[in-house]
């Protein structure tokens, strides 16, 4: 399985290590960037780590691998040894999503009585900044992170593209600043449900606020040709029945939409048919957040 991503993408992991690709299942982890860049992908047609991509390709849906091949044709012209940096800058977040955990959200950590904060800002400084042409690091929630704002104010000189993955809870003023600097900006809005399904999965972010944020980005897109928008859905047992509504909303917004299949927590995998386990999970999560399910 050919994929340029593992040689040109470095992920900042939640445990302070470096990873490759950022979309793998059970990916290798490395303590330094040199080891990460020396790792080689299996020659198998279907490496086990790449299951999320080849499962989508099997049903003729676009995969991260295919997108990476298209991107490689462009980015390799900018710099042959280009590097895309992704992963987790920190865990500062204003949302306690049902599919998330305390390691990626300070909101969840606080609900659990945990003071844990994951911060990879210094780890980012270890990277070869002269090779970085695209920044794809997230959180947490970028609009909620002082680290992320500082990073955007001090971008490495060769960065031409910034992708921001946001929960859509608020409009990010930094986007227009980047656009004015002629940097290509891709805003990926997580779209894990519409209406009450959104409000349950993305608690405490409200659907009414999310749609207002989307409208602001659509308006901004009319002003800047270097702004691209897309939706990303993490498909799981909580939003599977809502998927048609999700697709209809994306189509109405004229925003490209992609999705991936959730693997963790396993109880939310759409291939998991254990209803009792799902019910227990949902009850536990509702109790933690003090909410009820109103589908």
Model feature map: region roles:
Residues 1-69, 263-295:
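Accessory C-terminal segments flanking Radical SAM cores
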Residues 49, 57, 92-96, 101-104:
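Short pre-active-site segment immediately N-terminal to redox-active cysteine/selenocysteine motifs
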Residues 52, 60-83, 93-95, 114-117:
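Recognition helices and adjacent regulatory flanks at domain boundaries
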Residues 81-92, 103-119, 130-145, 157-172, ...:
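Core AdoMet radical
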Residues 127-131, 213-229, 253, 288-292:
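A structural motif corresponding to the C-terminal end of an alpha-helix
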Residues 152, 175-176, 211-218, 243-248:
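Generic structural signal for well-ordered alpha-helices
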Residues 177-184, 218-222, 251:
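Acidic (Asp/Glu)-rich catalytic clusters
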Residues 237-253:
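Catalytic cores of alpha/beta
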């Amino acid at each position: 399985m050919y994929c340029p991503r593992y040689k040109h993408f470095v992920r900042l992991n939640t445990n302070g290590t470096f990873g490759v690709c950022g979309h793998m299942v059970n990916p290798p982890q490395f303590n330094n960037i040199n080891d990460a860049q020396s790792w080689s992908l299996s020659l198998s047609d279907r490496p086990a780590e790449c299951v999320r991509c080849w499962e989508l390709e099997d049903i003729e849906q676009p995969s991260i691998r295919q997108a990476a091949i298209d991107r490689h044709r462009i980015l390799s012209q900018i710099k042959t040894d280009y590097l895309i940096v992704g992963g987790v800058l920190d865990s500062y977040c204003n949302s306690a999503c049902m599919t998330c955990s305390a390691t990626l959200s300070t909101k969840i950590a606080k609900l659990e009585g945990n003071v844990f904060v994951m911060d990879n800002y210094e780890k980012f400084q270890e990277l070869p900044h002269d090779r970085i042409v695209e920044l794809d690091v997230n959180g947490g929630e970028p609009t909620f992170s002082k680290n992320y704002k500082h990073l955007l104010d001090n971008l490495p000189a060769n960065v031409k593209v910034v992708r921001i993955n946001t929960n859509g809870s608020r409009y990010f003023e930094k986007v227009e600043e980047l656009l004015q600097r002629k940097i290509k900006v891709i805003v990926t809005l997580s779209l894990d449900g519409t209406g009450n399904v959104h409000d349950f999965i993305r608690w405490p972010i409200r659907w009414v606020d999310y749609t207002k944020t989307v409208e602001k980005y659509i308006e901004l897109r009319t002003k800047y040709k270097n702004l691209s928008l897309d939706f990303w859905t993490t498909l799981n047992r909580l939003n599977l029945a809502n998927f048609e509504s999700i697709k209809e909303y994306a189509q109405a917004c004229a925003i490209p939409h992609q999705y991936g299949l959730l693997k963790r927590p396993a109880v939310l995998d759409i291939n998991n048919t254990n209803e009792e386990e799902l019910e227990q999970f949902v009850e536990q999560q509702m109790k933690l957040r003090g909410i009820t399910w109103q589908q």
